[in-house]
């Protein structure tokens, strides 16, 4: 026959002293404050350090604003260096006198080039609208500006009325009657004077 050891009666706990109560309260408050600070830190990180889409690269969403302006994935606008494309609402005339939407066509061609991917731009200066003026490239298109001029979707554009960097490409497009050269058109600079921006 086995006998069990008798349980010793528990000694009554002594009541906490004021100092012990204050210490426990301080520990609880310290933990609460730490949790609140962590939450505040998380909110601040989310607000001020949230993910920004890349300006360029494989995951960037690069779009055309018109025939010579690109909006990068981070929202920065780039005007393509050395060219002047028909304005978005500008029309041109075919050789037979028929009107066509050359401004929309220039934007569509730029969009097609951008869809090739691997777009990058190297800023050279800023224009009066605070856009960066940049030489841009895309997959298989080392110089987007030159490509647009060579295909007749933009004009060579230099300072003042001087020749820009793509005069040879423009001469080629004009001789082959590509794009706007297949009929008649107002130079984009003249069209802007005749149709001022409302902003």
Which ranges hold each PLM region?
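Small beta-barrel nucleic-acid-binding modules, primarily SNase/OB-fold domains
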Residues: 2-199
């Amino acid at each position: 026959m086995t006998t069990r050891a008798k349980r010793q009666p528990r000694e009554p706990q002594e009541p906490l002293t004021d100092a012990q109560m204050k210490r426990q309260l301080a520990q609880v408050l310290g933990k609460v404050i730490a949790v609140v600070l962590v939450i505040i830190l998380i909110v601040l990180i989310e607000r001020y350090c949230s993910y920004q889409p890349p300006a360029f690269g494989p995951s960037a969403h690069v779009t055309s604003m018109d025939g010579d302006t690109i909006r990068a994935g981070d929202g920065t606008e780039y005007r393509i260096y050395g060219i002047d494309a028909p304005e978005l609402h500008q029309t041109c005339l075919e050789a037979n006198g028929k009107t066509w939407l050359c401004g929309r066509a220039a934007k569509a061609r730029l969009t097609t080039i951008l869809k090739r991917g691997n777009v990058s731009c190297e800023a050279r200066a800023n224009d009066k609208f605070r856009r960066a003026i940049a030489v841009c490239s895309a997959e298989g298109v080392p110089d987007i500006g030159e490509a647009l001029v060579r295909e007749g979707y933009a004009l060579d554009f230099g300072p003042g009325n001087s020749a820009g960097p793509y005069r040879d490409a423009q001469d080629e497009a004009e001789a082959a009657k590509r794009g706007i050269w297949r009929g008649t058109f107002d130079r984009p600079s003249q069209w802007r004077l005749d149709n001022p921006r409302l902003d």
